[in-house]
């Protein structure tokens, strides 16, 4: 139980949901698409809300332009708000955007670069995978648009992450799509299975083989002295190995600080929130278009401020001692489990404390791949890998 004597931090960082609309119709999207757009006035109020809180906390405010597809609001919000922040506010302010990339052109990418706006590109792979997973509303090809955008992103924004979601129908192409990302010039990727979909044992086996292909490629790259395209979850796996060993030595259980509600994403307990087009505050961006103000993830609005009573209520719904999956007792991660994504837990299982079985399976797979890589390259005393290990853990 988290008491009111715990001081909740002011919200200084936000996913600014500019619209619930999108030009794509992705098969797995959590957004309930509708023509609800944020006004520039609301965007300014949200920005000043974050600035005022950041000033009180002596921190740098930050915004991630989010959607739907935020590029639909390029002229209405992104350009004028960015110009105000960079040219009139003129103090440090972190800006980024999560986009499907299909509405980007050279001029816009140059604007993002000049104004130091970070980019996370949501793209699932080559033409076959991208067009199946992420078609246009009319069923047309989104890849045919992106093929001309990708070289511009790589040229102007070389640090952009290639962010993939995989589904059972296309999971046999995961490693091909990782290779596509690398060959296109990306230095890092992120992939996650759609946990809202049913995964058969056969499809899980295929996905596991795809990730082993990546691990083998990773190992061969280090043997050749070449930097592989990076997957941050593998680095997290290296950290988990150290945490698990430390927890075993100390006879501790669930040592990860992420198990504490006041340090966990999605519980309204941090400096982060999502702001919907109407100015409402939510603990997670996945909930802004799903349940409205009746949601347990609703925590106030930018006009009246955060509702700390609602934040405490949400925090106290989460209990790391109860957070569980299908078979925790034999799970390699049971000492350092972070309790999963509370929003996904809630939407799939009905409880913030109950993890989807597919999430657990995926986390165990990633740990197994990290162990496989570590044991192989560690046994070979690969110096390049040793330096990576030291830097990561």
Write out the residue ranges for each language-model feature.
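Canonical Radical SAM [4Fe-4S] cluster-binding loop centered on the CxxxCxxC motif
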Residues: 6-42
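Short glycine-enriched, charge-decorated loop/helix-capping segments at active-site entrances
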Residues: 32-36, 132-140, 348
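Radical SAM/AdoMet-radical enzyme domain recognition
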Residues: 47-66, 73-201
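Radical SAM enzyme core and accessory elements
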Residues: 1, 278, 289-292, 322-393
């Amino acid at each position: 139980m988290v008491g009111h004597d715990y001081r909740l931090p002011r919200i200084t960082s936000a996913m600014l949901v500019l619209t619930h609309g999108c030009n794509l119709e992705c098969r797995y999207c959590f957004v309930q698409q509708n023509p609800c757009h944020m006004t520039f006035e609301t965007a300014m109020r949200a920005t000043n809300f974050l600035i005022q809180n950041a000033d009180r906390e002596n921190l740098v405010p930050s915004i991630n332009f989010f959607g739907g597809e935020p590029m639909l609001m390029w002229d209405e919000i992104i350009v004028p708000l960015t110009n105000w922040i960079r040219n009139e506010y003129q103090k440090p302010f972190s800006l980024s955007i999560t986009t499907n990339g299909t509405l980007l052109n050279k001029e816009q990418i140059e604007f993002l670069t000049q104004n130091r706006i970070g980019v996370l590109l949501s793209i699932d792979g080559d033409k076959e995978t991208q067009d199946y997973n992420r078609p246009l509303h009319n069923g047309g090809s989104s890849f045919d648009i992106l093929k001309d955008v990708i070289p511009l992103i790589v040229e102007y924004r070389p640090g952009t992450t290639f962010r993939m979601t995989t589904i059972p129908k296309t999971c046999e192409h995961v490693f091909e799509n990782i290779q596509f990302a690398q060959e296109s010039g990306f230095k890092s990727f992120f992939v996650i299975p759609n946990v809202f979909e049913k995964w058969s044992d056969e499809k899980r086996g295929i996905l596991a083989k795809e990730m082993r292909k990546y691990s083998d490629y990773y190992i061969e790259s280090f043997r050749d002295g070449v930097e592989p395209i990076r997957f941050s979850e593998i680095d997290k796996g290296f950290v988990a190995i150290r945490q698990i060993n430390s927890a075993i030595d100390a006879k501790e259980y669930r040592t990860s600080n992420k198990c504490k509600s006041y340090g966990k994403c999605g519980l309204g307990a941090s400096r982060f929130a999502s702001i919907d087009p109407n100015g409402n505050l939510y603990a997670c961006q996945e909930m802004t278009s799903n349940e409205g103000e009746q949601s347990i993830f609703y925590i106030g609005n930018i006009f009246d401020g955060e509702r700390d009573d609602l934040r405490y209520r949400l925090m106290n719904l989460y209990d790391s001692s109860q957070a569980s999956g299908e078979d925790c007792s034999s799970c390699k991660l049971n000492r350092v489990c972070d309790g999963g994504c509370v929003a996904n837990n809630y939407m799939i299982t009905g409880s913030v404390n109950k993890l989807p079985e597919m999430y657990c399976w995926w986390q165990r797979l990633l740990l197994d791949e990290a162990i496989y890589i570590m044991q192989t390259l560690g046994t070979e005393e690969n110096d390049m890998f040793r330096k990576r290990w030291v830097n990561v853990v």
